[in-house]
Amino acid sequence: LHSFPTRRSSDLTDQTTNEGDWQLGDAGSTLNVNNVSRSNAHNPNVATLMDQDAGVVPDGFDPNHVTGENGGNAYPYGQCTWWVYQRRTEMGLPVGSYFGNGNMWADSARNLGYWVDNTPRHVGDMVVFQGGQFNADTTYGHVAIIEKINADGSIEISESNAKGLGVISSRTFSAADASQLQFVHY
């Protein structure tokens, strides 16, 4: 039989905090808690973004929602949907294999639990254009990726098939124009 010391309530006041450094196994090992995510996201890139979005993530948001990934890029080569799948995968961010046409991506993603709104937040956010919006195809819409968010709120995107099948190009949208679009975050 083992005997374990009894803890007094006064012992419980010396609790671990989330500030400073923790000493690990040996004196030369430290862990800076400022470099540790506070998110419960399994995807480390999503965890980092959630830390940056602390205070604005929707209540009840589950970062470990179903992603819709099902066997890789199922979109036709060179289409806008193909590019966005490729680029999000390169960035280590979740993306679904069967979100449909560009104009369907916000609803498809929202239905799986992704955070979707009208605010560009991060490089890697998916940008959804409705049919005819900013010269998007009137039937299929369009989808692109944020590559840069400028200090004035304007965004720079990369896209495919705006200048020809498989042609990767870029455009810049003012903050006012960007606010008219939908953004799929994570």
Locations of regions flagged by a protein language model:
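Short, small-residue-biased leader/transition segments that mark boundaries at the very start
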Residues: 2-9
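Short, exposed beta-strand "edge-strand" segments with a Pro/Gly-rich flavor and a Y/T-containing core
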Residues: 4, 93-102, 167-173
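Extracytoplasmic intrinsically disordered, low-complexity "stalk/linker" and propeptide segments
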Residues: 11-48
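Intrinsically disordered, low-complexity, compositionally biased regions/tails
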Residues: 24, 29-32, 59, 117, ...
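Secreted/periplasmic proteins that engage bacterial cell-wall peptidoglycan
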Residues: 41-143, 148, 159
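Aromatic- and glycine-rich peptidoglycan recognition patches
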Residues: 147-186
